[in-house]
Amino acid sequence: MAKKSKIAKYRKQQMLVAKYAEIRKQLKVNHDYESLRKLPKDSNPIRLKNRDEIDGRPRAYMRKFKMSRINFRELAHQGKIPGVHKASW
């Protein structure tokens, strides 16, 4: 479980990225790099670190399921992820 402050910071960054996405897109098309530089640093999507949606863990993140390997394994064993089952061959 990540610290609550890290999870809050991540959510705040996500909101900033969403808020400035259209503005950033227009400034890039117009090659207005001076105005682009004046936007908040956290509005840049490159600065976002993918985190687990359940507990905020930043490592071992699986993009397709938006969760860490630990939560993925736990939920898969419980059968709560549709279409996922243990492999056998």
From Swiss-Prot:
<keyword id="KW-0699">rRNA-binding</keyword>
<keyword id="KW-0689">Ribosomal protein</keyword>
<protein>
    <recommendedName>
        <fullName>Small ribosomal subunit protein uS14A</fullName>
    </recommendedName>
</protein>
<keyword id="KW-0694">RNA-binding</keyword>
<dbReference type="InterPro" id="IPR023036">
    <property type="entry name" value="Ribosomal_uS14_bac/plastid"/>
</dbReference>
<dbReference type="InterPro" id="IPR001209">
    <property type="entry name" value="Ribosomal_uS14"/>
</dbReference>
<dbReference type="Pfam" id="PF00253">
    <property type="entry name" value="Ribosomal_S14"/>
</dbReference>
<keyword id="KW-0614">Plasmid</keyword>
<dbReference type="InterPro" id="IPR043140">
    <property type="entry name" value="Ribosomal_uS14_sf"/>
</dbReference>
<dbReference type="GO" id="GO:0015935">
    <property type="term" value="C:small ribosomal subunit"/>
</dbReference>
<dbReference type="GO" id="GO:0005737">
    <property type="term" value="C:cytoplasm"/>
</dbReference>
<keyword id="KW-0687">Ribonucleoprotein</keyword>
<dbReference type="GO" id="GO:0003735">
    <property type="term" value="F:structural constituent of ribosome"/>
</dbReference>
<comment type="subunit">
    <text>Part of the 30S ribosomal subunit. Contacts proteins S3 and S10.</text>
</comment>
<dbReference type="GO" id="GO:0006412">
    <property type="term" value="P:translation"/>
</dbReference>
<comment type="similarity">
    <text>Belongs to the universal ribosomal protein uS14 family.</text>
</comment>
<dbReference type="GO" id="GO:0019843">
    <property type="term" value="F:rRNA binding"/>
</dbReference>
<comment type="function">
    <text>Binds 16S rRNA, required for the assembly of 30S particles and may also be responsible for determining the conformation of the 16S rRNA at the A site.</text>
</comment>
